[in-house]
């Protein structure tokens, strides 16, 4: 990366870089530092695939098409990734309002299992009835399409989050971001519950603990 990234920027100064390699949040930070590019032009694939899988599993559980199921996996692309239960909805109906225990150990509908499957399936491609596999290649093509076609679609991708949700360090985490021809143009400030914010901060601390020891950036 140390040799490749400066070369990319030298020959393509107006580029937008999408980082896909794991650990994606840390490598996106490293790429941002090495490239000298503004933060809206360095993006990590982050939780885009996790969120797609979450919606497919949610769809299977509810018997509703994935495109009509809304839910986000945010934070670190790792075991501490966060399912935003407070935002899960179908046609604007909040599932957490219908089932206040959603995602907890006391949840009779066992939504926690869906989150667990997302975490576990990150290491294998899920095959679900009637849908193509949302493998990482398709997921990245999805991000690129939003930029090439200037769609301004919202994706949960890894971006520099300092100043958001009380995070003070220069870390990259997945939040809902608008992607278009200019790159990552804005971050949607989702109304998260206190426990969700605490989890994001914990992810940020974990990442910073690793990053602060990275030399020569």
From Swiss-Prot:
Catalytic activity: (S)-lactate + NAD(+) = pyruvate + NADH + H(+)
Keyword field: Acetylation, Cytoplasm, Membrane, Mitochondrion, Mitochondrion inner membrane, NAD, Oxidoreductase, Phosphoprotein
Leading EC class: oxidoreductase
EC annotation from Swiss-Prot or TrEMBL: 1.1.1.27
Membrane topology: Peripheral membrane protein
Main subcellular localisation: cytoplasm
Active site, UniProt feature: 77
GO molecular function annotations of the record: L-lactate dehydrogenase activity
List of residues binding substrate: 22, 53, 132
Any single biological process term in GO: lactate metabolic process
PROSITE patterns registered for this protein in UniProt: L_LDH (PS00064)
Residue sites binding NAD(+) per the record: 22
Pathway(s) per entry: Fermentation; pyruvate fermentation to lactate; (S)-lactate from pyruvate: step 1/1
Pfam families, per database record: Ldh_1_C, Ldh_1_N
Subcellular location: Cytoplasm; Mitochondrion inner membrane
Residues annotated with Phosphotyrosine modification: 123
GO cellular component, one term: mitochondrial inner membrane
Modified residues (N6-acetyllysine): 212
Quaternary structure, from the entry: Homotetramer. Interacts with PTEN upstream reading frame protein MP31; the interaction leads to inhibition of mitochondrial lactate dehydrogenase activity, preventing conversion of lactate to pyruvate in mitochondria.
Protein family according to the UniProt entry: Belongs to the LDH/MDH superfamily. LDH family.
Role: Interconverts simultaneously and stereospecifically pyruvate and lactate with concomitant interconversion of NADH and NAD(+).
The name this protein goes by in its record: L-lactate dehydrogenase B chain
Species whose genome carries this gene: Oryctolagus cuniculus
């Amino acid at each position: 990366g140390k040799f490749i990234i400066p070369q990319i920027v030298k020959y393509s100064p107006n580029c937008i870089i999408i980082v896909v390699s794991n650990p994606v949040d840390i490598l996106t930070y490293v790429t941002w530092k090495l490239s000298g590019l503004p933060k809206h032009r360095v993006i990590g694939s982050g939780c885009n695939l996790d969120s797609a899988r979450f919606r497919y599993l949610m769809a299977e559980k509810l018997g509703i098409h994935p495109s009509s199921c809304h839910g986000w996996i945010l934070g670190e692309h790792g075991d501490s990734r966060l399912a935003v239960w407070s935002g899960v909805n179908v046609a604007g109906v909040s599932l957490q309002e219908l089932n206040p225990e959603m995602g907890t150990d006391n949840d009779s509908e066992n939504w926690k299992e869906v989150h667990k499957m997302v975490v576990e399936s990150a290491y294998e491609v899920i095959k679900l009835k009637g849908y193509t596999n949302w493998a990482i290649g398709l997921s990245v093509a999805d991000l690129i399409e939003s930029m090439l076609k200037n769609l301004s679609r919202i994706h949960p991708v890894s971006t520099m989050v300092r100043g958001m949700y009380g995070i003070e360090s220069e870390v990259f985490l997945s939040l809902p971001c608008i992607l278009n021809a200019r790159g990552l143009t804005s971050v949607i400030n989702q109304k998260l519950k206190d426990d969700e914010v605490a989890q994001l901060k914990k992810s940020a601390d974990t990442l910073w603990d690793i990053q602060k020891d990275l030399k020569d950036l």
